[in-house]
């Protein structure tokens, strides 16, 4: 199996605090991996290390068999697209189409080829009809889909989304996650997705969930395998996905008759 990302014996410290020590992680090409953990667990730092925005003290990072070094960092980055948390910080163009074109201009795509590439990328994420709109007129979810289109136009092998839905309302969050599912289905093994999140419901959509805390890999497996470890998740500051947490508490329902009012009162305690 081809490895999209391979991390061996990674060590990284910040302000004399060790964030990663002998950290190892392999991600197969075409896999959707959710990196989850509470704020400060190290997951966003890991993304910056993979992109070469931070430099590890020791260890190796390979992206599709290319070792990340000072000499190769720009070529490695060309294989990776990144979508960040705040959609407003990612727009540089006057219109949606201009924004998608910006990345293409940076890699010196011929101007005659740009319109087709822009239309293709916007169509994939369902934003083609908005291509002449000004970014400030879009919703948060629409802005993040445009950010995805800007990345897709560059044809990366890997897309990393760093808390890309954290600032969105439920509708915006849902549209972005639906778009990711569509990308997974459309591109298959040709596209590797890495979603960094603390939202467990989002993580259930991935092929694989990796739980990180204090720079250590705590759990690693399918969503079913990871979310069966309720105690370990709670010990690391995480909750189960809502449906799983509800199912757990329903199993603890008092074994006695309750009328409708009592049942409602008991259910209301589950949200505290």
UniProtKB/Swiss-Prot annotation:
It is a peripheral membrane protein. The active site is at residue 163. Keywords: ATP-binding, Cell membrane, Membrane, Nucleotide-binding, Translocase, Transport. SMART domains: AAA (SM00382). It is an enzyme of class 7 (translocase). It is found in: Cell membrane. Its EC number is 7.-.-.-. Pfam families: ABC_tran. The keyword Ligase does not apply. ATP binds at residues 37-44. Its main location: membrane. It comes from the Bacteria. Residues 5-239 form the ABC transporter domain. GO terms for cellular component: ATP-binding cassette (ABC) transporter complex. One of its GO terms (molecular function) is ATP binding. InterPro entries: AAA+_ATPase (IPR003593), ABC_transporter-like_ATP-bd (IPR003439), ABC_transporter-like_CS (IPR017871), ABC_transpr_CbiO/EcfA_su (IPR015856), ECF_ABC_transporter_ATP-bd (IPR050095), EcfA_1 (IPR030947), P-loop_NTPase (IPR027417). Belongs to the ABC transporter superfamily. Energy-coupling factor EcfA family. ATP-binding (A) component of a common energy-coupling factor (ECF) ABC-transporter complex. Unlike classic ABC transporters this ECF transporter provides the energy necessary to transport a number of different substrates including 5-formyltetrahydrofolate, pantothenate and riboflavin. Expression of the complex plus FolT in E.coli allows 5-formyltetrahydrofolate uptake; 5-formyltetrahydrofolate is not taken up in the absence of FolT or the EcfA1A2T complex. Forms a stable energy-coupling factor (ECF) transporter complex probably composed of 2 membrane-embedded substrate-binding proteins (S component), 2 ATP-binding proteins (A component) and 2 transmembrane proteins (T component). This complex interacts with a number of substrate-specific components, including FolT, PanT and RibU for 5-formyltetrahydrofolate, pantothenate and riboflavin respectively. PANTHER family: ENERGY-COUPLING FACTOR TRANSPORTER ATP-BINDING PROTEIN ECFA1, HEAVY METAL TRANSPORTER. This is Energy-coupling factor transporter ATP-binding protein EcfA1.
